[in-house]
Amino acid sequence: MSTNEYVLNMRQVSVDSKTHKNILSIENFTVRPGELVAVLGPNGAGKSTLLRTINLLQPYRGEMQLFGKDVRNTNKTLLRRRSALVFQETLLLDDTVFNNVAKVLKFRGTPTHKIKQRVYTALTAFSCEHLANQSARSLSGGEAKRVCIACGLVADSELLLLDEPSASLDVGIRPQMIEKIRQLAQERGSAVILVSHNFTDILHFADRAIALFDGCIIQDDNLETIIRRPVNEQLARLVGIDNIIPWWVERSSRASFIKLANGIKFLYPGEITKPITACCLSGDTFNVYDASSSILHKPWSVIIEGLVERVLNGIGICSIWVKVGEQTLIARVPRNNIFGNVYPHEIIKLAFNAQDAHFV
């Protein structure tokens, strides 16, 4: 794909703080038209700095193209008008809700006769059309956030940058708001870069994710791979891998055996070529073992025994804390995969596929 077919193309982009400390270092990051990308990372990783840099609000070094145009040789105001940034903070003018949203269109030269309809369409999409004549100062935190999102989407931007869009929203309406943003972006063909600490937002929204640590992209992949196969232990903890266990390998002339710190030992079917420190086992890789379970018919299956410490019955999922050796494993098992009931203080067996083990 040629560079003018990307809405964003960053090469060797660096940003320094006021104290000359490097806070962002992007070797290569591209976004295609219509692509939905999530940005993961701990606090202070540079996520908001990345969005401000893309929106040309942050001085930087390196090469960046927006909409196929070299930023250094193009009017930055014109480029910025083709994108929209919704800040984490609720930044609204001391004016009515209607005028806050309308000013976005006026700044972009939208014909006056089209403004009213577009403003109400944007407000309605995020359930705040009834707030149109209210002062922005009178809004609750959640209402102000929805108005900010409406401001971001009213202009049909080619690139939408969202910094924690679900912050301040009630838990009950977050999925609805995120789904609406996704729907509108897909209808318009807009590319979106979404920063969020809420993994539910990310799972419902993005097809691709980048993991940002200390200002650097450490993994760029589809969501399933990042969640199941994180590149290091830091990211494994961030995405919520249930079980991260120290391990070592025992090799023979014919095979490699993995021995975990809790005493579990199993034959591993693949090759281990890089230095690694921990074995990651997601809770949903486990099955509660039963003699009739189909896990017996899977290759490389591992069966372990432990003492149930705690059981949490959720909607459709049962979370079970099982003490194995000196460590506790967490298994998340579909309720219909459990034969009978599981209670604390009883001995149960768990089974998993060795190929589901991931090493970092």
What are these regions (language model features)?
Residues L40-P42:
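The feature captures the beta-strand-to-loop junction immediately N-terminal to the Walker
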Residues G62-V71, L79:
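Conserved ABC transporter NBD signature motif
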Residues H113-L131:
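Conserved ABC ATPase "signature" region
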Residues S135-L139, E143:
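Conserved ABC ATPase signature
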Residues L160-E164:
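Catalytic Walker B motif of ABC-type/P-loop ATPase nucleotide-binding domains
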Residues N262-R310, N337-V360:
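Glycine/charge-rich catalytic "coupling/switch" loops of P-loop NTPases
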